[in-house]
């Protein structure tokens, strides 16, 4: 019997080759389909089909490859977060920390003596981009000016903080309260009494926030 080996299959990447006597050889060089010496009857070379270079076939292969890769990446992200501590909190029973620069519900502040801080300069009214602030003022007997009307339409306010930045005496501020939803539109039309009440309620937190942020103001 001839010792000539009959190569049944050959890999493009030069993997294992099988002979008629069952010997297994490791190809050192790349084997192309044209290198096959003889294909016995009953055997079919299954890797002989060339990849189609049509645009539709190329896009299909690329989409399949990317989809499979993104699918594995998504699974990896999911598995990585399964064992991590949840980032959510049980609101409203739990609340996250707020920055000292947080811009919430508006308030008018007083001095420790109880005197209103606002000097009716109307800078906040002038700078408000939403035109949500309306101020009326009059002069007192001692020559100082104080507001007789200070209204804020909270439905117009965009919480930009310009009013607080423009105020020279830190009278109008945006406090730490963000839970002030209402059932009617009228409840969001704040007058001077409402704003002063907010200031009295949140004065301690407002003062500490202003102190914590004083280097950046």
From Swiss-Prot:
Keyword Hydrolase: no
Chief location bin: mitochondrion
Effects seen without this gene: RNAi-mediated knockdown is lethal. RNAi-mediated knockdown in the muscles impairs biogenesis of the mitochondrial membrane respiratory chain NADH dehydrogenase (Complex I). RNAi-mediated knockdown in neurons impairs neuronal ATP production, reduces locomotor activity and shortens lifespan. In addition, results in large vacuoles in the retina, ommatidia disorganization and selective axonal alterations in mushroom bodies.
A GO MF label: metal ion binding
Cofactor requirement: [4Fe-4S] cluster
Cellular localisation: Mitochondrion
Catalytic reaction(s) noted: a ubiquinone + NADH + 5 H(+)(in) = a ubiquinol + NAD(+) + 4 H(+)(out)
Binding site for [4Fe-4S] cluster 1: 118, 121, 124, 128
Recorded superkingdom: Eukaryota
4Fe-4S ferredoxin-type domain residues: 109-138, 148-177
InterPro entries: 4Fe4S_Fe-S-bd (IPR017896), 4Fe4S_Fe_S_CS (IPR017900), NADH_quinone_OxRdtase_chainI (IPR010226)
Keywords: 4Fe-4S, Electron transport, Iron, Iron-sulfur, Metal-binding, Mitochondrion, Oxidoreductase, Transit peptide, Translocase, Transport, Ubiquinone
EC number: 7.1.1.2
Transit peptide (residue range): 1-26
PANTHER family the record matches: NADH DEHYDROGENASE [UBIQUINONE] IRON-SULFUR PROTEIN 8, MITOCHONDRIAL (PTHR10849:SF20), NADH DEHYDROGENASE UBIQUINONE IRON-SULFUR PROTEIN 8, MITOCHONDRIAL (PTHR10849)
Designated name of the protein: NADH dehydrogenase (ubiquinone) 23 kDa subunit
Organism in which the protein naturally occurs: Drosophila melanogaster (Fruit fly)
Record lineage: Eukaryota, Metazoa, Ecdysozoa, Arthropoda, Hexapoda
